[in-house]
Amino acid sequence: MEDTTETTETTDTTAVSRLVPLAPAPARAPSMDAVNGSFDSELTTARRFNCQSCVRKKIKCNRAVPTCASCSKAKLHCVYQSRPPRKRKRSRGEEDVYERLAQYERILHDHNLLQAAAASTPSGRDTETSAISTRAPTPVLPDAQTHTKAGKVLLSTDGRSRYIDNVLLLDAGEGDLCELPESEQEDYNHDETSPDESTPTGLLGALAAHTISGAIIGNTQSLTNLHPTYEQAAKLWQAYVKNVEPLCKILHVPTVAKMFDTVSKQPAAVSKNDECLMFVIYYFAVFSMSDDECLHEFNYPRAQLLSRYQTTVIQALVNASWLKTTAMPVLQAYTLFLIALRTQIDSHTFWILTGIAVRLAQRMGLHRDGESLGLPPFEVQMRRRLFWQLLPLDSYAGQTSGTGISISPSSWDTKQPLNINDDQIFPGMTQPPCEQRGASEMIFCLSRMELSNFYIRTGVKLKEHGDTIQFRDAEDIERLIDEVEDLIETKFLRYCDILNPLHFLTTGIVRSAIDAVRLRARMPLLKQQTITDAQRRRLCALAEKVLDTNSTIFSNPSTQNFRWQMQAFFLWDALLCILRNIAEVGFYSPSELAAAWSKVANVYANHDELVKARRTLYVTIAKVTLKAWLANPPRDSSPQPAFITALLTQHEPKGINQQQNSVLSDDKAADGASLFDEFFDNMNGTDLDINNAFNLDSSSDWLFWDQICRGTSLS
């Protein structure tokens, strides 16, 4: 093997010539013949490599300097150029290090613990300039073809899916990335602790004490004996189909109905994935029913049934290894569970749990549209339905927890599901279904999706700093609201039959929601000193319209089975506007004041959580209501409403005393409205800030003053 180290060379010169360096090396002493001036007798010093001419001719070179014999004879320019240094071979030990590093990156990536900037490995580098090098992450592009090249979905025969968007993992080959069979997973997840060691202690014990956190660290347990009887299961399934499924459309009812009928007869034969669906259906069915219905159908109080099935849902998720699942039934069950829990648990805990659902969906590739990934038509529709339920749920969680963080619109390209009925799609279909015109089973969900997609579709611009969306001016807001209203009216509401409970609910909620958007856009006028009486009354009329629609939906007997949805949906802007104007003594006439308080009473009658719950938002609304009552109660001598009595009882220890405030001066009456002004200090009439996706279900997503409420003392 030739040495590639270049040595110093000597340039020979005649006695009358100058020394001319041919290489960047110190010159040696000239030969005696050179000193004596004998050019013809010049001695040469050989190079350690051939000249370029001899290399090309593939002839022997005597490597003389400055000109070899061959070049001198042929009168060619003799050029010596050293070979580039050869890349040193990696030792086997170094290869092992890179292989282990790639393996560890795969593990971290599978558990979403590897940041995008560190998602590459030095094992495939081309240079030796550094010990470890990383590639810059590929930017997310909206082009569906780009997504197809950047990542792919791997489907197994049992319907599992795994989305891969990492060059290393793709290079590893698809075969290594498939999920383990369920039988192997059981052995892999087997708890090796003894029975005495299985009970978590310390911090783990504190986590396990919380029913939800226990699902993260719990052990597998059989649920066969906890299934209801076949007759009870049939009743729960019918309740779910009637009360829940029309408003969620996460499941394909014909397919699940067959599975449900088979499994409810033989619970021991159910798979772990399907068992998650079974128990969440039981739980959600009970959640959607009243206490009287539960007692009549099952002879148990609603609270007792909810507690029982909530425990079994959590255990079923543990049994299915839900934190690393790639199975659609498990994520469908978990999403349904979160929808029911959204108003039942702490908002910060709910935000974390919703984040888990989003990560699982991204791991399964739901954030990429199935058509661009080449999936079957049935899979495409079901994945779209599930992802578009997670979007508003994630936005709701981010808003109610105060983080304001939700899925960035630039991180997904999943299209809305088609306007079709369940009988138009089925597993194994090869041709995409034809979308129908008019009202379908998807009418409620699609109407909500149009509103959720409102800001993304209508050409809004992003702020220079942050991810919130900002319109240019009030005229743009009004124009865009009109456009989305016309779109929804044309596509859906014009086909609604108000005798159909689902259509009646859809019409009421959507029109109420659009009015609430208009109200939100105009609410900052209340803070302006130049607002006219006519402008204020137009705002009041709009707010009253929203409250009246809400009360109408609640009072309609045909929509009683959808009340669970209405508990999570209320447009608080309208209530705030009414209370703000009630607090202005003299704005309402006595008859108008009585009518306004009647509308507020209806709100509290329909939303008893305003009195019972202790969430920050509800406590703030209660304080605002009491301020308005103490500043400007009705003029008649009717008895004090029950909701005011309950609020005074709860908040009197906090410093609100009705007796001390029974007679208010004009200054104190003005102070009664001062609390409202705090909600408008940072608002103006031209900006409308919404965090990412618009969420029809989120009360705080409608409530632009919610974050200011969180900064207001509740004492």
Swiss-Prot record:
Residues 119-144 are annotated as: Disordered. One of its GO terms (cellular component) is nucleus. GO terms for biological process: DNA-templated transcription. Residues 119-136 have a biased composition (Polar residues). Its main location: nucleus. Residues 51-78 bind DNA. Coiled coil: none annotated. Signal peptide: none annotated. CDD domains: fungal_TF_MHR (cd12148), GAL4 (cd00067). Pfam families: Fungal_trans, Zn_clus. One of its GO terms (molecular function) is zinc ion binding. Viridicatumtoxin and its derivative, viridicatumtoxin B, exhibit anti-methicillin-resistant Staphylococcus aureus (anti-MRSA) activity. Moreover, viridicatumtoxin and a C2 acetyl analog, spirohexaline, have been demonstrated to inhibit bacterial undecaprenyl diphosphate synthase, a potential new target for antibiotic development. Keywords: DNA-binding, Metal-binding, Nucleus, Transcription, Transcription regulation, Zinc. It is found in: Nucleus. The keyword Transcription regulation applies. Probable transcription factor that regulates expression of the gene cluster that mediates the biosynthesis of viridicatumtoxin, a tetracycline-like fungal meroterpenoid with a unique, fused spirobicyclic ring system. This is Transcription factor vrtR1. It comes from Penicillium aethiopicum. The gene is vrtR1.
